[in-house]
């Protein structure tokens, strides 16, 4: 983990200025450039990069700050192709930006090797875990965990997660797979049943899918006899349409016999007995599904209406 930043003092600024003036008159760096390593050697606790950034940000006037223009980005891209990562030379050619600005702009935005896809859930969890380990050292997090993303992108993503109050889940849990599975009662039936239900007496070769509504138009229509077990030939069953009762083979004739206690004039209730079946008799043949004309039974009258 890198050390926390320390503000530059007035004494350090004065020493930096003097050392730069010496290097400017007699540069000891490669290709007669400013030797920032030599300058940093005389300022305890400061690296060559710290000295270079402080000098350009503190003493160089006439440089532009803030957002980069499209023209500046295009010019920086061409200069990097030509001079690689020689930021001091690039800054001199840019004229409007210092070396530190050019370096940050390239590594944070313009480098074509940077990963620019949206952050995944796994990456977010890894980022939160890395912050717990490395703190706010974004360069260390980038080097260890996200080499294809810029440090600035990593910092911005953590800021977004913090604003959304997204915290790191326990180590044994994962947000993608630790959600409780729905109960059996809340699960919807599968689109295709594991076994096709069979209708009793259904025709061979016909399929039935209760979840496939499109099969209703293609499935053959079933008649009433398809749902009845096979029976030997039997006489037609007579059904009394008026009284709503089965006769003949069933051996049942409806008799209304109220309790004699309710009728003083007819103690035995014989006056209320209805031996004759009222209404027209219709015979319904369950074998062929046809209604036949009225049938007159011996000893009984059939009323014609």
UniProtKB/Swiss-Prot annotation:
Query: Where does this protein reside within or beyond the cell?
Result: Nucleus
Q: Phenotype upon knockout?
A: Results in a significantly reduced expression of orsA and orsD, and in complete loss of orsellinic acid production, during response to Streptomyces rapamycinicus.
Task: Provide one Gene Ontology cellular component.
Answer: nucleus
Ranges for domain Myb-like come to 5-59, 60-110, 111-162
**Quick check: keyword Transmembrane helix in the entry?**
no
Recorded GO molecular functions are: DNA-binding transcription factor activity, RNA polymerase II-specific; RNA polymerase II cis-regulatory region sequence-specific DNA binding
InterPro entries this protein is in?
Homeodomain-like_sf (IPR009057), Myb_dom (IPR017930), MYB_TF (IPR050560), SANT/Myb (IPR001005)
Which example biological process does GO assign this protein?
Answer: positive regulation of transcription by RNA polymerase II
Q: Summarize the protein's role.
A: Transcription regulator that acts as a central regulatory node for the integration of external bacterial signals leading to the regulation of secondary metabolite gene clusters such as orsellinic, lecanoric acid, cichorine, 2,4-dihydroxy-3-methyl-6-(2-oxopropyl)benzaldehyde (dba), emericellamide or microperfuranone clusters.
From the Swiss-Prot or TrEMBL record, give the protein name. Answer: Myb-like transcriptional regulator basR
């Amino acid at each position: 983990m890198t050390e926390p930043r320390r503000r530059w003092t007035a004494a350090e600024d004065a020493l930096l200025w003097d050392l730069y003036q010496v290097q400017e008159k007699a540069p000891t760096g490669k290709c007669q450039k400013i030797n920032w390593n030599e300058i940093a050697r005389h300022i305890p606790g400061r690296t060559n990069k710290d000295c270079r950034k402080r000098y350009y940000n503190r003493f160089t006037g006439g440089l532009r700050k803030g957002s980069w223009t499209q023209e500046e980005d295009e010019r920086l891209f061409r200069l990097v192709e030509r001079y690689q990562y020689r930021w001091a030379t690039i800054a001199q050619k840019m004229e409007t930006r210092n070396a530190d600005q050019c370096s940050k702009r390239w590594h944070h935005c313009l480098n074509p090797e940077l990963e620019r896809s949206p952050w995944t859930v796994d990456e977010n969890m890894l980022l939160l875990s890395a912050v717990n380990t490395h703190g706010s050292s974004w360069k260390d997090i980038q080097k260890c965990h996200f080499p294809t993303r810029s440090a600035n992108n990593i910092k911005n993503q953590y800021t977004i997660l913090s604003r959304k109050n997204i915290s790191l889940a326990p180590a044994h849990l994962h947000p993608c797979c630790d959600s409780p599975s729905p109960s059996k009662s809340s699960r919807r039936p599968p689109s295709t049943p594991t076994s096709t239900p069979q209708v009793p007496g259904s025709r061979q070769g016909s399929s039935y899918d209760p979840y496939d509504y499109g099969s209703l138009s293609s499935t053959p229509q079933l008649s009433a006899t398809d749902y009845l077990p096979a029976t030997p030939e039997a006489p037609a069953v007579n059904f009394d349409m008026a009284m709503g009762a089965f006769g003949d083979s069933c051996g049942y004739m409806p008799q209304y016999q109220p309790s004699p206690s309710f009728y003083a004039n007819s103690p035995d209730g014989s006056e209320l007995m209805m031996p004759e079946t009222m209404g027209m008799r219709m015979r319904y043949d369950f074998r062929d599904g046809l209604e036949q004309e009225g049938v007159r039974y011996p000893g009984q009258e059939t009323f014609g209406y």
